[in-house]
Amino acid sequence: MLEDVIKELREGIEKAIEALRRDLAKVRTGRANAAMLDGIRVDYYGVPTPIVQMATVSVPEPRLISVKPWEKNQVKAIEKAIRESDLGLNPQVDADLIRLPIPPLTEERRREMVKLTKKNGEDCKVAIRKHRRDANEMIDSLEKDGDVSGDEADRAKKKVDDVVAEGTKLVDTVIAGKEKDILDV
C-alpha cells in the first residue's frame, strides 16, 4: 500500500518535470530549435493545425530553422502564422521553403526569458508540492484506517520528503541548464 503511494508520487513528479522540459523547449535561447514552433497553429482548411503536422521542420544551421510545407499552397498560411506569433521571427519564403533566421537575443530579452524560465520552474515545484500533499494525505488516511502503523506512516512520510527533495533538485538542475543556454551569447 505504502509502496503504491510512493510509486504514484514518483510518477506525478516525473510528469511534472516532463511538462517543464516541454515548456522550456519552446523558450527561445538564441539558438535554433524546432520545438520553438510547437505552439504555432496554422489555419488549415478552417482547422487550427500545428506546423509539424503540415510541414517538415529542420534545423540545418545553429541559427536557422527551415520549414518545408508538404502542400505548396500552404506556404503563405504558414508564413503568416509564424509572422503573427509572439516569437519575433521574420520568415523568408524561397519558393516552397520557409527559412527562419534566429536573431541573437538582446540583453533585455534574455532577462525576460530567464524570468519566464524561473516562473516555469516555480510552477513545476508547486505541482511537486501538491503531489507531496496528496501522498501525505493518503498515508494519513491509511494510518487512520488502521492499515499501517504510526511508525510505518512516519517512515513513509520521510520517504515522501526524500522523493520530493530529489524532484525539486532535478527541477533546479533543469532550470539552471536552461538559464545557462539563454545567457550564453
Curated annotation (Swiss-Prot):
Give this protein's Gene Ontology molecular function annotations.
ribosomal large subunit binding
Quote a single Gene Ontology cellular component term.
Answer: cytoplasm
InterPro entries named in the record: Ribosome_recyc_fac, Ribosome_recyc_fac_dom, RRF_sf
UniProt keywords (A-Z) are: Cytoplasm, Protein biosynthesis
Q: Where is this region: Disordered?
A: 139-159
Which cell locations does it reside in? Cytoplasm
Q: Name one GO biological process term.
A: translational termination
Pfam families noted in UniProt: RRF (PF01765)
Q: Which Gene3D superfamilies match?
A: 3.30.1360.40, Ribosome-recycling factor
Spell out the Basic and acidic residues composition-biased ranges: 141-159
- SUPFAM superfamilies listed in its UniProt record: Ribosome recycling factor, RRF
**What's the family?**
Belongs to the RRF family.
Q: Which PANTHER family match?
A: MITOCHONDRIAL RIBOSOME RECYCLING FACTOR PSEUDO 1, RIBOSOME RECYCLING FACTOR
Q: What does this protein do?
A: Responsible for the release of ribosomes from messenger RNA at the termination of protein biosynthesis. May increase the efficiency of translation by recycling ribosomes from one round of translation to another.
Would you tell me the protein name for this molecule? Ribosome-recycling factor
Taxonomy-wise, where does this protein's organism fall, top ranks first?
Bacteria, Pseudomonadati, Myxococcota, Polyangia, Polyangiales
Gene encoding it? frr
